[in-house]
C-alpha cells in the first residue's frame, strides 16, 4: 500500500458524494463497496475535477441506508456543495489481495461475454446489485451504429459458467 500517492495509478470507483446535509459542511455519501462501512478503511480517497485531488474525511455517520461524511476543513454548506455528485476513487493497490478464483467487480468491467455456443454477446459495461442477485450489464453493438444493453443475472454456476478476469472473458448460459 502506498499512502504517498498523489493520484491513483489504477483508479477504482468506490462511492459517490451526494448533496449537502445541514449547514456545517456535511454531505450525503453513497458507498459502492459490498460491505458499505468497509469504505472507511480505504485511504486515500481521490476525486477528479480538472485533475486528481485527495480528500480527507474527518467524520462519518450512518444515515438511513447510507452515510453522511464531513470533509476535513470544510465548515459550511456552500463550500461542500461543490463536491455534490463527485465520484470517490481509491487506488487498486490498497485493496486486499484476493484468492485465485476471486475478483473485484471492477475486474469484470470490459470482459467479453460469450454464450455456451461461443457466440459473442457483448462487453460488460457495468454491474448492479438488486435484492436477489447481482446483474451484468452488457453492451452489444454487433450492428453498425446500433447497440443494445443486455442484462444477465450474475448467478454463479447456473448462468455464469466461466470467468477469466485475466483474459477478460466470461461464458454464460444465455440465448
UniProtKB/Swiss-Prot annotation:
Keyword ATP-binding tagged: no
One Pfam family here: PRC_RimM
Subcellular location: Cytoplasm
Sorted UniProt keywords: Chaperone, Cytoplasm, Ribosome biogenesis, rRNA processing
UniProt free text on domains: The PRC barrel domain binds ribosomal protein uS19.
Subunit note: Binds ribosomal protein uS19.
Function, in words: An accessory protein needed during the final step in the assembly of 30S ribosomal subunit, possibly for assembly of the head region. Essential for efficient processing of 16S rRNA. May be needed both before and after RbfA during the maturation of 16S rRNA. It has affinity for free ribosomal 30S subunits but not for 70S ribosomes.
Protein name: Ribosome maturation factor RimM
Gene giving rise to this polypeptide: rimM
